Structures are given as C-alpha cells and as structure tokens.
C-alpha cells in the first residue's frame, strides 16, 4: 500500500553510517540505536568486511569507532585496532581519504577515542591532539561524571554550549596528556569541546570528579575542521531520560541532540 511505499522511500533517503566493529568491541549496539533514533541507516561493519571490500567507506556519510576492548587492549588500549589500519596500505588509504573529506564525519568513543588518538598521521588537523594514558587512579573507572560543554568547532555540540550534563565513563586508559604548547593551539582553534567539572561546576583535574586526571579536564577533542571527534565518555549510554542519575521531567535526553546534530550536518 501507499504507506509501505512511503516507508521504503524514507529508508532509502536516510544517510548511511558505518558502526565499525573489531575483535573485542562491545558498544556497537547502543551506538547503532543512537544513530538510528536520530534518523540514520546504521550498518554493522566489521573491519574485515572493509578489507575484503564487502563495504566501502565511500558509501557512508559517517563512521563510528565504538567502545569496548579491541584486541584485549594488548600493547595499549586502541593500539591493535589502530595498527591494523596503519599497517594495511589499502585500509590506511581508505580511512585517510574518508577523514580528509570534510563533508563526512568520524566519531570515536571510549576505545574508539583511543584508536583515533593513534591515527593522527592520517587525520588532517589532529597533529596537536593529546595522548591517552593510564588513569591517575591506576584502575578502571566506570560510573557517572559531570561535564561542561564549551564552545567549539564540533557540530556534534551545536546548541549545547554551556550545558552541564552527567555522562557515563568506562575506561582504564582515559587520561588526556598534552603539553602547554599543543593545548594552547587546540584552545585557540576551538578544538576542545567538553571538560570534566566538579560539584561547583568548575573545570577540574581532581579525582573523583575527573575520573582519569586529564589535563584541564579535557574529555573531547575535534580535528581542526571539526568533522572528526574523539571523546572518552559514552553519550550513547544516556539516550533515555530514565538512565540519568537525577530525575527530570524532561521528555527527551539532552544527549539526543548530540546525535541529531550529526543528522543536520550530513543534510
């Protein structure tokens, strides 16, 4: 009937996003749901499927590196996944081409953030990004934290600037370490989009408000053009208002806007 035809047409019009998956990744279900709710057609894309050319990144408007423990965090969180890309010439070229296309976007969350931090040689405008190392607590931190969104060049946070929001962290190597020179460059270029804050709303490096000891509370960094974003916390785990630690009368989660902004970007 006509209604079914409309549904088929609408499905075809949805932008396609590749939810990347590698051995040990476990955050792909929530991430796929988050982007699907925002109006994307989410594809489960195993890295080997790209190597075997079952999928081509060119066919997608966005790619996401999800959370988990890729390759068991052997030799450092995210290292195995990143090296799989860097040491396969065809794969490296394909990702470099995608990262360079400013009409498309890339997102790395948690383990995905760790992966992107190790791919700076193929991500334009990421040369000043921080390194990620073991949490100051020297243990895995999995809980709610408070963050403040600041004005940046990342479209993901459009209209969210100034918001102080709870979010979930789950990592053992999330400390963003950076020297003063690179920090100043990132700040000048508006590449810093979110920071950890304490109970008074002040940016902090102190535990437990800052779960890992990141410099100046940094938790989210974008490329110079703004189309590539790496962040340690999980916005996809707070899509339902019932998942928030504090009861609210709001109908929708404020983190829904994060994913809706991605849809606006590709449109």
Regions found by a protein language model. Name each.
Residues 1-109, 113-125, 133-142, 148, ...:
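N-terminal beta1-alpha1 cap of cysteine-dependent amidohydrolase-like domains
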Residues 149-267:
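C-terminal and late-domain segments of enzyme folds
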């Amino acid at each position: 009937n006509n209604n079914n035809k409309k549904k088929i047409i609408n499905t075809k019009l949805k932008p396609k996003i590749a939810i990347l998956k590698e051995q040990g990744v476990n955050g792909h279900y929530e991430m796929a749901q988050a982007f699907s709710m925002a109006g994307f057609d989410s594809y489960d894309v195993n890295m080997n499927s790209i190597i075997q050319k079952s999928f081509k990144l060119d066919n997608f408007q966005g790619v996401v590196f999800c959370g988990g423990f890729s390759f068991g965090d052997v030799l450092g969180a995210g290292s195995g996944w990143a090296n799989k890309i860097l040491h396969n010439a065809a794969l490296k070229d394909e990702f470099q081409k995608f990262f360079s296309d400013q009409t498309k976007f890339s997102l790395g969350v948690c383990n995905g953030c760790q992966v992107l931090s190790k791919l700076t040689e193929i991500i334009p405008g990421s040369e000043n990004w921080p390194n990620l190392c073991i949490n100051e607590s020297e243990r895995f931190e999995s809980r709610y934290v408070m963050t403040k969104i600041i004005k940046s060049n990342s479209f993901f946070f459009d209209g969210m600037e100034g918001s102080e929001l709870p979010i979930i962290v789950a990592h053992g190597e999330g400390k963003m370490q950076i020297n003063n020179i690179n920090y100043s460059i990132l700040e000048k270029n508006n590449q810093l989009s979110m920071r950890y804050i304490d109970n008074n709303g002040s940016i902090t490096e102190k535990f437990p408000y800052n779960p890992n000891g990141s410099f100046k509370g940094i938790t989210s960094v974008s490329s110079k053009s703004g189309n590539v974003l790496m962040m340690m916390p999980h916005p996809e785990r707070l899509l339902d208002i019932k998942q928030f630690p504090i009861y609210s009368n709001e109908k929708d989660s404020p983190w829904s806007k994060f994913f809706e902004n991605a849809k606006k970007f590709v449109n």
